[in-house]
Each structure stands twice: as C-alpha cells, then as structure tokens.
Design a protein with these regions (language model features):
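Short helix-loop boundary/capping segments
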Residues: 125, 131-200
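Sec/Tat signal peptide C-region and signal peptidase I cleavage site
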Residues: 19-25
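Bacterial N-terminal signal peptides that target proteins for export
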Residues: 1-10
Length: 261
C-alpha cells in the first residue's frame, strides 16, 4: 500500500508539473485603431498598405517545450503582395523582453526609441518576412553591440491575421517562465531597401509617400513606430511623444515602458 501511495504521489506531482508547464503563456490585448504612432501618423499611399495592417490587436507568448512561441494579431487580413513566400509582406515586428535586471536603454537602429529607466530590454525577437540570414546579417552590420541579444526565428509565417514565429528558450535567457516576463512590442514595416543605418525599417517622414509613412519629421528625431503595446500605466500616446529641434535633431526621444501581466 505504501508503494502504491508513493507511486500515486509521484504521478500527481508529474501531472501538476505538466499543467504548470502548459499554463506558461501570456496574452496581451491592444486597442484597435491606434496604428497612428503618437497619434497622427499616416500610412503610405501605395495600396499594399491596407488599413489595419499595422494595428496590433493581440500578442500571445507561449512556452512550448524548449521553445518560446510568439504570435501577433493585426487588424487586417494578411497578404503577400511582394512575394515573400511566408504569408505576409509589409509588416515587421520587434518583441522586446525584460527578464533580467539592467539591460539596453536604446532601441534598435531605425526605430528611434529609448526605454525608460527600469524598463531596459534584455532580449528582442524579430518577426520579419525576410529570410533569417538577411535579418541576422543586417543586425550584425548595423547593431553589432546588440546582436547577441537579438533572436530571429528560423521561419516566421503569417496566416489569416496572425504573424507567428518560435525561438529556443535558451536564446532568451532568464528563467524560462515566459508568463512572468515583461514585454514591449513595436509594429514597424518590412523595408527591403532600408537607409544605411536602419535595421530593415521603414521611415516616417513629414508627409506620406508611396512607401513612406507620414505625420512625423524628415529627421530622425521621431519614433518610426506605428503601434506598441499599452497599459493603464503606459499609454501609447505618452510613450511615443517626442520633441524635435529646428534641424531635425532629437530633443526629447520617444521612451517606452515594458508591459507585464
């Protein structure tokens, strides 16, 4: 009888552990219709940039064995007008993670954002329709001091309204408890011909163009960001507020905060 009770206890403990592992997921909902950056950004004029394409509606992070799966929903059906072959073309998503003390206060090249004290990021996962080799190569060239903390899925795919990719948990460090980490998600646009220092990101100018967002500044003092996660204590309009000098220099940069459940 004692052996039977011991076996039952072990079985129950195993089931509880499995349940805990399966429960390691976190979901963030984001308001619809806020894909305007700090409030006044405008989509490019080309028809490939459909309304809602850059509007984050939900972000889900799930621990699946030794992998972390990232899924981002947008407010428009995904299309592949540029023939990227992965179910989407125009979006590019940066998922910043805080799972350790300290971290990086500067965003990645081309985003023109910083992170507030105490909200510095430790790792970032990039969901791009570009091949992994292209994204990693650009990161090595344009963000050499940060590349060790950049992860890119082997394959990122889009289906219906969801863009999804997975990376090994070992690349993200921390304790592996994805539901306990803090996150910030930036929606940008896949740019195959980026500016010299930009990490495959599309610029925001004063006036929109065929392949340029409008409503910002022709300098690099404005955040090149269409949407981010927000919470009651971290409003998008406040985080993306910025001030430019007369020559397009940054006086007050957009400063992001991490969001945690």
């Amino acid at each position: 009888m004692k052996n039977n009770k011991t076996a039952l206890a072990i079985c129950l403990a195993s089931l509880l552990a499995l349940g805990t592992s399966a429960a390691q997921a976190v979901v963030f909902d984001d308001p619809k219709g806020d894909d305007k950056g700090p409030g006044n950004y405008i989509y490019p004029t080309d028809s490939v940039y459909k309304a809602g394409s850059f509007d984050i509606t939900k972000v889900a992070i799930t621990k699946n064995g030794d992998q972390a799966e990232f899924a981002v929903d947008v407010n428009s059906s995904l299309e592949d007008p540029w023939g990227m072959g992965v179910g989407f073309s125009v979006q590019m998503i940066f998922i910043f993670i805080k799972n350790a003390p300290d971290g990086h206060a500067d965003g990645l090249p081309g985003l023109n954002v910083k992170f507030a004290p105490g909200h510095e990021w430790n790792k970032v996962v990039i969901l791009s329709p570009q091949k992994k080799a292209r994204v990693v190569g650009e990161a090595q060239t344009k963000a050499p001091k940060l590349v060790a903390d950049i992860s890119v899925p082997n394959t990122t795919r889009g289906n219906n309204r969801t863009i999804k990719g997975s990376v090994p948990l070992s690349e993200l460090g921390g304790d592996g408890n994805v539901d306990a980490w803090a996150y910030q998600v930036i929606m940008q646009s896949n740019e195959g011909f980026p500016a010299a220092g930009d990490l495959l990101t599309r610029k925001v100018n004063e006036y929109e163009g065929q392949h340029r967002f409008g409503g910002g500044n022709d300098g690099d003092c404005d955040p090149h960001v269409m949407d981010v996660l927000e919470s009651a204590d971290a409003k998008q309009s406040e985080m993306l507020a910025y001030t430019c000098g007369p020559n397009g220099e940054s006086v007050k940069p957009a400063t992001l905060k991490m969001i945690k459940k």
